[in-house]
UniProtKB/Swiss-Prot annotation:
Function: Involved in the biogenesis of TorA. Acts on TorA before the insertion of the molybdenum cofactor and, as a result, probably favors a conformation of the apoenzyme that is competent for acquiring the cofactor.
Short name of any one Pfam family annotated for the protein: Nitrate_red_del
Protein name: Chaperone protein TorD
Annotated compartments: Cytoplasm
Name of the gene this protein is made from: torD
Lineage of origin: Bacteria, Pseudomonadati, Pseudomonadota, Gammaproteobacteria, Aeromonadales
Protein source organism: Aeromonas salmonicida (strain A449)
GO cellular component: cytoplasm
């Protein structure tokens, strides 16, 4: 159980990190943190996982370019706006890659779960950041569940969001983002997120049956 709790905390942190990354422009202070010991250690720990290693290497290379980029915060903000906010943007919304019903399904899910994201995310609720943030919250609910049955329920909710939403459309977003990002920071981040989502789906398929025993 302790291993489950530790893994849950790490998974939630990853989802929230990616949610922040794709939801708003990074400030210069946030960019500077990518040169900190904590972030370097964090990425190094991810690179110990074989499926993640090439994606982490690509992101580290993009970070190295970003840290020495002229007016880096302004330049990265321009990348963000051009990629995700312009008329020809790579839309970070599920409904833009599947169909309009995706937005309604996510709205219904949040209502059923009694989760309100409006204060944190002004975007429509099928935005990538919202779906990633939701996964982080569901992970913590599973970790804090007082019984095996409730833990099983929250693990099932995680699988539903992953397979019913994120994995259904994110691969399309990832391809488009990588093709449209010449500097490469967001493209590399999307690649790493894609690997993580696949690995997390595999993790859930393994941990869900085993979690039924306290």
């Amino acid at each position: 159980m302790q291993e489950f709790l530790a893994t849950s905390e790490r998974r939630a942190e990853l989802y929230w990190w990616f949610a922040t990354l794709f939801s708003a422009e990074l400030s210069d202070k946030q960019i500077a943190e990518y040169d900190s010991y904590d972030v370097r250690s964090f990425l190094k720990s991810l690179s110990t996982l074989d499926p993640m290693r090439p994606a982490v290497t690509e992101l580290n290379e993009a970070i190295a370019r970003l840290l020495v980029r002229d007016e880096r915060a302004t330049a990265l903000a321009a990348d963000f706006k051009g990629l995700f906010l312009a008329d020809t943007a790579v839309q970070p919304y599920e409904s833009a890659h599947l169909d309009a019903s995706s937005l309604g399904r996510m709205q219904q899910r949040l209502v059923r779960l009694a989760i309100d994201v409006s204060a944190k995310y002004p975007q429509p609720v099928d935005h990538l950041g919202v779906e990633l943030d939701l996964m982080g919250n569901l992970i913590i609910r599973a970790a804090e569940a007082p019984s095996a049955d409730q833990r099983e329920q929250w693990l099932g909710e995680q699988e539903a969001v992953l397979h019913g939403h994120l994995l259904a459309w994110f691969p399309h977003f990832e391809v488009a983002c990588r093709a449209a990002d010449p500097f490469g920071f967001y493209g590399a981040s999307a690649r790493l997120l894609g690997v993580f989502l696949t690995m997390d789906a595999n993790y859930l398929s393994l941990v869900k049956p085993a979690s039924s025993a306290d």
